[in-house]
Amino acid sequence: MKWYVLQVMTGSERDVCTALRRKGVKARAPDQRMEIRRRGQWQTEDRLLLPGYVFVGAEYTAALFHVVSPVPGVIRWLGLEHGEPQALDTREALRWRLDSDETLEPSRVLFHADGTWHVLDGPLAAFAGCPVRMERRQRRAYVTAELGGVARRVRFGVIPV
């Protein structure tokens, strides 16, 4: 089975996944757990890892295209070249944790006094070679990663250790 990426209308990712599952297509919109500060208190919330994108796991055929494309909210297949979208390779699929339906926990990050940091565990560890901007105060990490052949900025939650 290969994984493909759909661009969908932002806010309709879960609805698109539900509609695709009803049609027998394996679909995922990965969630992550993040800590958000509101009114002076840290609260835990589940947020989409990639707003505006849904991953579809299947072997690509013309029939699959005609099942998926008319679903309300689907805009286009990413990487559609020469009539067939580009599939994610196995390494990339594992990086986005498409093998499990679990919500991703925040990555644990060790911050040093000299301003450097080291990722101990969590989903951020899979993006070791990508450019990362760390915001310790907001407990966020922004990673520039490639998705469907285009560089995208992805936000991850972190827990300072």
Segments (PLM) and residue ranges:
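Short glycine/proline-centered loop/turn elements that form peptide/ligand docking sites
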Residues: 113, 123-125
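Short beta-strand-centered aromatic/proline hotspots
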Residues: 125-134
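Acidic-enriched and Gly/Ser
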Residues: 1-118, 133-138, 142-161
